[in-house]
């Protein structure tokens, strides 16, 4: 994320692809819900070091970015905290804005086979999705759907043996189904 886009979002506020979090006390405990939500939806940005005030969002900064990053990576790579290590080194950066450090975490959308991305070792209570500016806990049915989608190989990527041309397709397809 470039500086101009970041400053514009600070003026506009949060939405479906950006979440601001204060990091005054270190890594926020609720960051993992947001990582899960972005990974299970369309991806997004988590900006650490931006606080809410009565007048809107303000850049408060991150005091010790290296310690915060160490804590982030230790938890990110712990399967008891986060089911899938979704971010890579290039997804995390420290940016100086107004003489203060911000940590920008780009959370990519998880592949279908990686979902659900969940926290605390429990897919039924630890799977989140993003809806406008909030993270919400997925229902058991949503989680089961993600698990089904992850396990099933779509029919359109399977190679059907014995088909030499599309002209043969209808007859051979019907015959292959009849023999199953």
Tell where the protein language model's regions lie, with residue ranges:
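Conserved N-terminal catalytic/coupling substructures associated with nucleotide/phosphate chemistry
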Residues: 1-180
């Amino acid at each position: 994320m470039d500086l101009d886009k970041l400053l514009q979002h600070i003026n506009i506020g949060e939405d479906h692809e950006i979440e601001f979090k204060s990091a005054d006390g270190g890594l926020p405990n609720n960051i993992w819900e947001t990582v899960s939500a972005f990974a299970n939806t369309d991806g997004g940005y988590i900006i650490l070091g931006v606080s809410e005030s009565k007048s809107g969002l303000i850049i408060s900064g991150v005091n010790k970015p290296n310690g915060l990053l160490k804590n982030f990576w230790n938890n990110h790579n712990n399967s008891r905290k986060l089911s899938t290590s979704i971010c890579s080194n290039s997804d995390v950066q420290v940016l100086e804005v107004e003489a203060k450090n911000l940590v920008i975490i780009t959370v990519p959308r998880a592949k279908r086979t990686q979902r659900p991305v969940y926290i605390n070792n429990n897919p039924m209570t630890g799977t989140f999705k993003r809806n406008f500016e909030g993270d919400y806990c997925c229902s058991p049915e949503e989680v089961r759907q993600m698990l089904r989608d992850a396990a099933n190989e779509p029919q359109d990527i399977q190679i059907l043996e014995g088909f030499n041309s599309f002209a043969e397709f209808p007859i051979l397809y019907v015959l292959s189904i009849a023999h199953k």
